[in-house]
Amino acid sequence: MKTLIRKFSRTAITVVLVILAFIAIFNAWVYYTESPWTRDARFSADVVAIAPDVSGLITQVNVHDNQLVKKGQVLFTIDQPRYQKALEEAQADVAYYQVLAQEKRQEAGRRNRLGVQAMSREEIDQANNVLQTVLHQLAKAQATRDLAKLDLERTVIRAPVDGWVTNLNVYTGEFITRGSTAVALVKQNSFYVLAYMEETKLEGVRPGYRAEITPLGSNKVLKGTVDSVAAGVTNASSTRDDKGMATIDSNLEWVRLAQRVPVRIRLDNQQENIWPAGTTATVVVTGKQDRDESQDSFFRKMAHRLREFG
């Protein structure tokens, strides 16, 4: 009888342990497959494309690639003598028309005072018209001078924000044209994460929810908050023909690939450029609060590690 009870107890304990293990593994599997997470996430940052507003030869480059610069710091300089001469020419035109306008103003004033008793109405009107023409030319010359002054100022290209110089492709002696991108400036303290979540997991993603970010190849877990969810993505299976009619690609009803939607995550602490914009990471949305690691089971910890490195 004791042998039978002992055997039954061992069997019952084994069954209970198997059931508990199955439940733990099942919960870990559900946690792994159904909770909001993705390995398709990238660090991003605000990038300022810097292009000169004037054309000319580059006479000096003051920075090097990947250098951290401050707002207002000189990046490079474009040939200034040409624009200095243009400003001097414009200033000379302004001085000339100022003198001419003064002469024509005196002439028109004298004729208006004398009136039709001393000369014809046509001569008076002609003097007034000449004055207006000269005043117009003066205003135009002043505008040209101001533009020349602005062009001269813009031969010195400065950093509009604090950030890192990236992909510097200008060198002393090169000719650069107006509007051509010369430097990409990665704005400091603007890093965030774009996580491309499957549409099936968006129900567990809301602005304000907490998130964990694990950079690829790193054991460090960063904290962040869901900032926003994209309002729409492109429908790749629908286009329009040349007559505006909808064209829908054929697909298999039993094969439906979940669309990925960008989710923007704001980092709690800016990581400078330790993980540059464009590098990948794993993102897990933990809900309204951060995950309490002390409450995780062994299987959940395994599932979490699989997400990060699997």
Curated annotation (Swiss-Prot):
Keyword field: Cell inner membrane, Cell membrane, Membrane, Transmembrane, Transmembrane helix, Transport
Locations listed in the record: Cell inner membrane
GO terms assigned for molecular function: transmembrane transporter activity
InterPro entries hit by this protein: CusB-like_dom_1, CusB_D23, MFP_Efflux_Pump, PHBA_efflux_pump_AaeA, RND_pump_MFP
Transmembrane segments: 12-32
NAD is among the record's keywords: no
Similarity section: Belongs to the membrane fusion protein (MFP) (TC 8.A.1) family.
Protein name: p-hydroxybenzoic acid efflux pump subunit AaeA
Organism of origin: Escherichia coli O9:H4 (strain HS)
Organism taxonomic ancestry: Bacteria, Pseudomonadati, Pseudomonadota, Gammaproteobacteria, Enterobacterales
